[in-house]
Curated annotation (Swiss-Prot):
Annotated binding of [4Fe-4S] cluster 3, by residue: C123, C126, C131, C166
Binding site for [4Fe-4S] cluster 2: C78, C183, C186, C189
Lineage: Bacteria, Pseudomonadati, Pseudomonadota, Gammaproteobacteria, Enterobacterales
Gene: ydhY
4Fe-4S ferredoxin-type domain segment(s): 59-88, 114-145, 147-176, 174-203
Gene3D superfamilies: 3.30.70.20
Protein name in UniProt: Uncharacterized ferredoxin-like protein YdhY
Pfam family, one: Fer4_11
Residues noted as binding [4Fe-4S] cluster 1 in the record, renumbered to the chain: C68, C71, C74, C193
Record bears the keyword tRNA processing: no
Induction text: Up-regulated by the oxygen-responsive transcription factor FNR under anaerobic conditions. Repressed in the presence of nitrate or nitrite via the two-component systems NarXL and NarPQ, respectively.
Residue sites binding [4Fe-4S] cluster 4 per the record: C135, C156, C159, C162
One GO MF term: 4 iron, 4 sulfur cluster binding
InterPro entries attached to this UniProt entry: 4Fe4S_Fe-S-bd (IPR017896), 4Fe4S_Fe_S_CS (IPR017900), RnfB_subfamily (IPR050294)
Keyword Iron: yes
Length: 208
């Protein structure tokens, strides 16, 4: 089966492993009031998708759509910190493409989450990473020390196979460097967010 056609939850990290509970993950779970307070949202916000929860090895990235103003500071901070240059297209956190950017540019179609809808998105650090599986030279590997899947820029040939294979198209090839990049869980996006639309909550602070 083409990896893009596989169900998203089959590809992503199982929330069972992260939460150490049985049954469904955060998106379908009745969350304890104390944890909801920590996440800064209500149960109905999670159920409706207004609040997004992206599980990573280091913690949960909480995205609150209603708080996002589309200022792009998260993307700017990400690329400045990781690349030494500023560019929203090759940012590891994705905001711009989720507004009204279609496949062929501005105004050509709805964003991934609907028109006029800012939604932060980034790498899920998949348990079975399709980006890593399809890389023809093995430039994408799991790094135990960093706790994430990374791209070795010395080996990357910029073929974009990783982007095509990812169901969310998260790995992005920088058109200037010709190298692919993806989230390394540095947290700069959340640090730069002026409205609290992005938060990273470490697993040690989450109990269920």
């Amino acid at each position: 089966m083409n990896p893009v056609d596989r169900p998203l939850l089959d590809i992503g990290l199982t929330r069972l492993e992260f939460l150490r509970i049985s049954g469904k993950g955060l998106a379908g779970l009745t969350i304890a009031p104390a944890l909801l307070s920590l996440l800064g949202c209500k149960q109905e916000d999670i159920d409706s998708g207004t609040v997004g929860l992206i599980n990573t090895p280091k913690g949960v990235l909480v995205t609150q759509r209603a708080r996002c103003t589309g200022c792009h500071r998260c993307e700017i901070s990400c690329t400045n910190f990781n690349d030494g240059s500023v560019g929203t297209f090759f940012s590891r956190i994705k905001i711009h493409r989720n507004y009204f950017f279609g496949d062929n540019g501005v105004g050509s179609g709805g964003g991934l989450y609907g028109d006029l809808n800012y939604t932060a998105d980034t790498c899920r650090q998949c348990k079975e990473p399709q980006c890593m599986n399809v890389c023809p030279i093995g430039a994408i590997t799991w790094q135990q020390k960093e706790g994430c899947i990374t791209v070795d820029h010395k080996r990357c040939i910029g073929c974009s196979a990783c982007t095509t294979a990812c169901p969310w198209m998260m790995a992005t090839v920088n058109t200037e460097s010709k190298k692919s990049s993806k989230c390394v869980l540095c947290g700069e996006c959340a640090n730069a967010c002026p409205t609290g639309a992005l938060k990273i909550i470490e697993w040690k602070d989450i109990t269920v």
